Amino acid sequence: MKIQFLFVLLSSYLCFGQNKTEKAIMLYSIDQYIKPVYNLSTDAALELASRISKAAYTKNKNVSIVLLDASRTTVLRMRGNGVGPHNTEASRRKAYTALSTKTPTLLLLRNSEKNPDTKNQNSLPELLLLSGGTPIWYKGEIIGSVGVSGGGSPENDDWIAQSASIPEIGITTTK
């Protein structure tokens, strides 16, 4: 008898517990929450590295190259023969700086020297205000960045980094 009484008592909770009395919250369309992002692929990184190496070769230089995708993930990292190991980390930080600021690092360096309010940007831990970093663009969107070190001069590093383009398909270092 006690079991039947408990069953009757609890069955009402089970039946009425399933009623939904809350109103549904109106959500925005999916486009308000999720955006597609172009990203640098491994194949593109390999092609860019080949073009960068050829540009460095025309200046008789071996360089370290780091390519990051739009989410700051390292897609490719390579060090030319005879290039010091510190150059590879410098290349990564140049690429990070270019990606983070969406500005070539040589331009960023020169602009920060002119403006006392931005001169302390070099004190931020990951930013490296040395030439040789540049963002990589596709259809007006940043898809990654490149950092180049070991070119022998700031102008060489910048010029070599600017060669990270595949204009045939719209990948360039200019917006």
Language-model regions, residue ranges each:
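Flexible, solvent-exposed loop/hinge segments and secondary-structure transition points
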Residues: 19-175
